[in-house]
Amino acid sequence: MSRKCLVITVSGLAGSGTTTLCRNLSRYYGFKHIYAGLIFRQMAKEMGMSLQQFQEYAEMHPEIDREVDRRQIEAAEDCNVVIEGRLAGWMVKEADLKVWLEAPIQVRAQRVARREGISIEEAFMQIAEREMQNRKRYLNLYGIDINDRSIYDLVINTFKWGPDGVFAIVKAAIDHLYPDGDAGSGANPGNKS
């Protein structure tokens, strides 16, 4: 498939830094940012459920996941987009760059606690429960093992590198794809003519 623009997927578990990276990429390159987690949260709100309740509801209603995935795949048809979601790398098969971010669960729990205004212990328990539910659901629904990182072009430990380091690594990869500095301008990295 010949593409005249860049499509990047950024995936990772809760608190790994996916939103921070996507916002930085969006600001720097002017990419449109599609966030699967926000879609999921909006759907929970529309149904009057907490995120945890909606997570449990989604386990029994596969149409929820399929709708989120449909929106991600649809978004990948746009030019110059960064798509954020745990399964984005799996769903957007022809992405130009697939990134997985990770960090130790203790670090992720601290980040989530700070973001959500809850205790670290509560965040840790929520993350552990959510990851167990998601892994089971993704295996049952799609046959995808969320722990399989083999499809990703980059796997980055955000605890080790921090937001600036992570951005620099991904920027270097994008600049390699677009050596003439044309990322976001609609140029095709494989076509030098």
Curated annotation (Swiss-Prot):
<dbReference type="InterPro" id="IPR027417">
    <property type="entry name" value="P-loop_NTPase"/>
</dbReference>
<protein>
    <recommendedName>
        <fullName>Cytidylate kinase</fullName>
        <ecNumber>2.7.4.25</ecNumber>
    </recommendedName>
</protein>
<feature type="binding site">
    <location>
        <begin position="12"/>
        <end position="20"/>
    </location>
    <ligand>
        <name>ATP</name>
    </ligand>
</feature>
<dbReference type="GO" id="GO:0005524">
    <property type="term" value="F:ATP binding"/>
</dbReference>
<keyword id="KW-0067">ATP-binding</keyword>
<dbReference type="GO" id="GO:0006220">
    <property type="term" value="P:pyrimidine nucleotide metabolic process"/>
</dbReference>
<dbReference type="Pfam" id="PF13189">
    <property type="entry name" value="Cytidylate_kin2"/>
</dbReference>
<dbReference type="InterPro" id="IPR011994">
    <property type="entry name" value="Cytidylate_kinase_dom"/>
</dbReference>
<dbReference type="GO" id="GO:0005737">
    <property type="term" value="C:cytoplasm"/>
</dbReference>
<keyword id="KW-0418">Kinase</keyword>
<dbReference type="GO" id="GO:0036431">
    <property type="term" value="F:dCMP kinase activity"/>
</dbReference>
<comment type="similarity">
    <text>Belongs to the cytidylate kinase family. Type 2 subfamily.</text>
</comment>
<keyword id="KW-0547">Nucleotide-binding</keyword>
<keyword id="KW-0963">Cytoplasm</keyword>
<keyword id="KW-0808">Transferase</keyword>
<dbReference type="InterPro" id="IPR011892">
    <property type="entry name" value="Cyt_kin_arch"/>
</dbReference>
<dbReference type="GO" id="GO:0036430">
    <property type="term" value="F:CMP kinase activity"/>
</dbReference>
